[in-house]
Amino acid sequence: MRLMWIMLFAALGLAAQTKMPNLALNCPAEASSVENQNLLPEFAVDGKTKTRWSSAHRDDPQWFKVDLGAVKTVGRVVILWENSAALDYKIQLSSDGENWIDAIHKNDGKGGEENLSFSPQPARFVRFTGQFRIQQ
C-alpha cells in the first residue's frame, strides 16, 4: 500500500468538520512493513503532504496503526493516496490495541483523496488494513 497520509477526526457536526483537529497528527504510528527508511509510518501522520508511509512490495494484507494516546471519539478518516492505493480495505478501531471492530470496509477504493465518515465510536487505536491493491 502506498498510503500518503492519514487524518483522523473527532465526531462533530458537519458545519464544524473543516475546523476539526486532526487527532492523528504526530501520534505514534506502526505498520506491518515499510518500503524503505524514507517512507516510515510516522510520515503518514506528520501533517506534511510531501511525506508518506509505504509498505514493502510483498503480499497483502498490509496494515498501518495509529495510537491516539487516549480513548477519543472518532467518526471520520481522510486518506490521501500516492499513485498506488488499496481497492479493498478496512478502517478498524480499538480501545486496547488487541480487540478490533470494523468502522468501515471499503471494497471499491479509487485512490486520490478518500473522505470516510462513519458512526462515531470511542477508540485509542485506529488501524488501516489493506486487503488488495489497485496497482502493484
Segments (PLM) and residue ranges:
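Disordered, acidic Ser/Thr/Pro-rich linker "stalks" and the adjacent N-terminal cap
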Residues: Q17-V74, L80-Y89, S95-N99, H105-G112, ...
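Positively charged n-region of N-terminal signal peptides that target proteins for export
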Residues: M1-M4
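Hydrophobic h-region of N-terminal signal peptides that target proteins for export
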Residues: M7-A16
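Short, conserved beta-strand segments of beta-strand-rich sandwich/propeller modules, principally
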Residues: R76, F125-R127
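Linear, non-domain "peripheral" regions
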Residues: S117-P120, G130
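Short beta-strand-plus-loop segments that form exposed binding edges in beta-rich domains
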Residues: T129-Q136
